[in-house]
């Protein structure tokens, strides 16, 4: 039983102890809140300490961030107006003020946040990687030189090998070109021989056609026709050089030798297009060129047969006449019209030469085509076939062979009329006259070419103008777009600036909030913090150039500090100094000098106290000495400020006096007593001059009258009489002219006193009165 009782007693004791432990244990929610509160307070204190450290070290942005975070933490926990937030807001505003000074100051650190030391360290590492010439020995230098020379020698050897490889390749190319040239010469020679054979077989056909054309009308004609061909390599020098002979050159040569009755024909065709295009013939006689192209069968105006001339292309691109067809011309009375159209000129020129000898032999020099000519004798005309590359030349009485080249103009149509052809003497004459056209074909061609060129130029100019206008429009559009974009950007920037609050404004808000929080507390520490808040608010006002507000804030700070601080405290000296600066900025130099002098007094008191404490102290006086040295360094700066304030006061007084003088002169001009005396003196000086020159005035008037009345002779006499009368009146009483008004007054007084004494005095006064009246008028 005893064991059971002891067991139950033990169980009950355990239960009671468990209940007590549960009662003593706090609730889980309240414990978590306490832990969080402790964490926030400790974190805020850490941030405040870190911010003060950054502020002392000069890292202003880091200090601002630390104080901002601390203020936000405390504000979330206690509320923005809680007493616990006052210190965080104060230091946050102070750091913002320093940041604003750094941004606005000219001597601010522009490289803030840039890791200059790290960059320098990187540079040193890079430089260490590069070898320095000073550290290299002579042996190393020699090795480097040998390596450089070896490398350069290898480069030169490679260059020479490249050149040696290039030379044989060039030689091979030249040899292949020479072989190709020889083959081309051989190829060119073969068609030339064939041309000779074919052209030599042509005289029989030529004679037959000429005989049929002549009939009985031409007793004498061409007996023989010798056609000789030259090789293409014996071409005219101008054709070999690729030069083209213009129509003006042909006309000049024809005009020089027109008296000999030579007709020159020159044709230029593409060798490859000879079979496709019809032959083109240019006839010239006595300086009149004619271009003929047999595009279609020629309508001769009668019932004569119509025949076509066809050209074929040789194996080497050379056209040779296969069919020679004669055409009969109508009688001399009829004038058929031949429509000629020039074919397109190509790069290959073929100058043809045909000469008629006096003996009646025709010598034809073919090059690339067939000649189709025209010759007449007697009353009828006979046709002679020619190759495309030749022209027929009709001569008189054994004229010499002439060589002329002409370049055909593409797409040219001319109408020619063949007039009467007559045969006279032993020779053969061919006369071809142009139709009665207003302008020659060459002129027409030139005019057409000029018109085409002008049209092209105008089109080009119009195109350029349109392009230029389009470009200008595009540029204007771009400029407008850029302006609109810039305007939008400026607006957005202005809006952002308006939205963003400056550091000074934010500092003012934080310090004002801290001042309110500290002022409602009665403790000395809180009041001193409030005084410091007033001081920093004054500095913000100075930065924003609101000097009156700054003076008010500094004065409030001074009042609070004087209540709770000793007379030798350095905070008082600082407040006096800041107040003196504010007065100086506000042009209140007397008050500025007074505040600066009070600051010096406080510093001197502090130095005296430190000296006493240093004497009393038994230990090392190093701390006191350091503070004394700091205070001594501050004194010269404050004294310099005093001198500046006094000097500016003097200059300001002088400027004020000058300004007042100018204002007084401008406001009282003409109304001051000096102005009145000057006006009186002017009046007095005018009176005697008027009195003295009264006679002169009369003479001037008489002079004017004399000019207007020239025929009157009495006017000068009357003027002289008036002068004689007036002069004794002016000079009689006093003997001299009156110079001033004061003399007139004195004479009047003297004459008034002497009236009763003598008649002479009375007469003098009368004369003086007369003079005064004369001067007054």
UniProtKB/Swiss-Prot annotation:
Biased composition (Basic and acidic residues): 152-186, 227-259, 267-276, 303-319, 710-728
Function text: Component of the histone chaperone network. Binds and stabilizes histone H3-H4 not bound to chromatin to maintain a soluble reservoir and modulate degradation by chaperone-mediated autophagy. Required for DNA replication, normal cell cycle progression and cell proliferation. Forms a cytoplasmic complex with HSP90 and H1 linker histones and stimulates HSP90 ATPase activity. NASP and H1 histone are subsequently released from the complex and translocate to the nucleus where the histone is released for binding to DNA.
Positions where N-acetylalanine occurs in the chain: 2
Biased composition, class Acidic residues, residue ranges: 464-474
Residues that bear N6-acetyllysine: 34, 243, 285
Region (Disordered): 152-496, 667-777
Protein name: Nuclear autoantigenic sperm protein
Subunit architecture: Binds to linker H1 histones. Interacts with histones H2A, H2B, H3 and H4. Interacts with histone H3.3. Interacts with histones H3 and H4; NASP is a histone chaperone that stabilizes and maintains a soluble pool of histone H3-H4 dimers. Interacts with ASF1A and ASF1B; the interaction is probably indirect and mediated by H3-H4. Also binds to HSP90 in the cytoplasm. This interaction stimulates binding of NASP to H1-6/H1T.
One Gene Ontology cellular component: cytoplasm
Protein's gene: NASP
Gene source species: Bos taurus (Bovine)
Annotated region (Histone-binding), positions in chain: 117-128, 211-244, 458-501
């Amino acid at each position: 039983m005893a064991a059971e009782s002891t067991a139950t007693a033990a169980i009950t004791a355990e239960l009671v102890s468990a209940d007590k432990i549960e009662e003593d244990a706090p609730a889980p929610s309240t414990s978590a809140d306490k832990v969080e509160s402790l964490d926030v307070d400790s974190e805020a204190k850490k941030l405040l300490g870190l911010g003060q450290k950054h502020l002392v070290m000069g890292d202003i942005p880091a200090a601002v961030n630390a104080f901002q975070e601390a203020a936000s933490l405390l504000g979330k926990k206690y509320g923005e107006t809680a007493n616990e937030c006052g210190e965080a807001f104060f230091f946050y505003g102070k750091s913002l003020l320093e940041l604003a000074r750094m941004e606005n100051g000219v001597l601010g650190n522009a490289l803030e946040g840039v890791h200059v030391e790290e960059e320098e360290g990187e540079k040193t590492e890079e430089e260490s990687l590069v070898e320095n010439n000073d550290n290299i020995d002579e042996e190393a230098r020699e090795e480097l030189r040998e390596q450089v020379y070896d490398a350069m020698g290898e480069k030169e050897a490679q260059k020479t090998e490249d050149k040696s490889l290039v030379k044989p390749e060039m030689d091979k190319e030249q040899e292949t070109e020479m072989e190709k040239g020889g083959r081309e010469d051989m190829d060119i020679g073969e068609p030339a021989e064939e041309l000779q054979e074919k052209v030599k077989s042509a005289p029989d056909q030529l004679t037959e056609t000429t005989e049929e054309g002549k009939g009985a009308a031409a007793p004498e004609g061409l007996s023989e026709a010798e056609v000789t061909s030259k090789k293409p390599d014996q071409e005219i020098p101008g054709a070999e050089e690729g030069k083209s002979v213009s129509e003006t050159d042909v006309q000049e040569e024809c005009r020089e030798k027109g008296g000999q009755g030579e007709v020159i024909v020159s044709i230029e065709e593409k060798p490859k297009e000879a079979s496709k295009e019809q032959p083109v013939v240019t006839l010239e006689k006595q300086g009149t060129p004619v271009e003929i192209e047999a595009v279609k069968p020629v309508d001769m105006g009668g019932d004569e047969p119509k025949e076509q001339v066809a050209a074929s292309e040789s194996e080497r691109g050379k056209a040779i006449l296969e069919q020679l067809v004669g055409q009969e011309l109508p009688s001399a009375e009829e004038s058929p019209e031949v429509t000629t159209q020039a074919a397109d000129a190509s790069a290959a020129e073929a100058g043809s030469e045909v000469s008629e000898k006096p003996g009646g032999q025709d010598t034809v020099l073919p090059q690339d085509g067939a000649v189709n000519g025209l010759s007449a004798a007697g009353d009828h005309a006979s046709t002679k076939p020619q190759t495309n590359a030749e022209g027929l030349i009709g001569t008189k009485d054994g004229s010499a062979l002439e060589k002329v080249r002409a370049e055909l103009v593409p797409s040219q149509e001319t109408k020619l009329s063949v007039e009467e052809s007559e045969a006279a003497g032993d020779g053969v004459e061919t006369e071809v006259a142009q139709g009665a056209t207003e302008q020659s074909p060459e002129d027409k061609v030139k005019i057409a070419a000029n018109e085409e060129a002008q049209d092209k130029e105008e089109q080009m100019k119009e195109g350029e103008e349109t392009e230029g206008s389009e470009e200008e429009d595009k540029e204007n559009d771009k400029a407008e777009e850029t302006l609109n974009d810039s305007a939008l950007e400026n607006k957005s920037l202005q809006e952002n600036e308006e939205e963003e609050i400056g550091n000074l404004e934010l500092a003012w808000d934080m310090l004002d909030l801290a001042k309110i929080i500290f002022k409602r507390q009665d403790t000395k520490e809180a009041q001193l913090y409030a005084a410091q808040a007033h001081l920093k608010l004054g500095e913000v006002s100075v930065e924003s150039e609101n000097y009156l507000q700054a003076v008010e804030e500094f004065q409030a700070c001074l009042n609070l500090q004087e209540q709770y601080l000793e007379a030798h405290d350095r905070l008082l000296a600082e407040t006096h100094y800041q107040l003196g600066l504010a007065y100086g900025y506000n042009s209140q130099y007397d008050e500025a000098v007074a505040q600066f002098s009070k600051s010096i007094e406080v510093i001197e008191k502090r130095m005296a106290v430190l000296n006493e404490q240093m004497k009393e102290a038994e230990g090392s006086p190093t701390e006191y000495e350091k503070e004394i040295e700091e205070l001594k360094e501050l004194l010269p700066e404050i004294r310099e400020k005093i001198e500046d304030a006094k000097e500016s006061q003097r200059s300001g007084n002088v400027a004020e006096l000058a300004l007042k003088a100018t204002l007084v002169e401008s406001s009282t001009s003409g109304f001051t007593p000096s102005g009145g005396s000057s006006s009186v003196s002017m009046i007095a000086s005018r009176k005697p001059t008027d009195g003295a020159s009264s006679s002169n005035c009369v003479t001037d008037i008489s002079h004017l009258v004399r000019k207007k009345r020239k025929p009157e002779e009495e006017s000068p006499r009357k003027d002289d009489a008036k002068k004689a009368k007036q002069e004794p009146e002016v000079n009689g009483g006093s003997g001299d002219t009156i110079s001033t008004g004061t003399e007139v007054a004195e004479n009047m007084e003297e004459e008034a006193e002497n009236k009763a004494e003598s008649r002479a005095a009375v007469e003098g006064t009368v004369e003086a009165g007369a003079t005064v009246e004369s001067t007054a008028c």
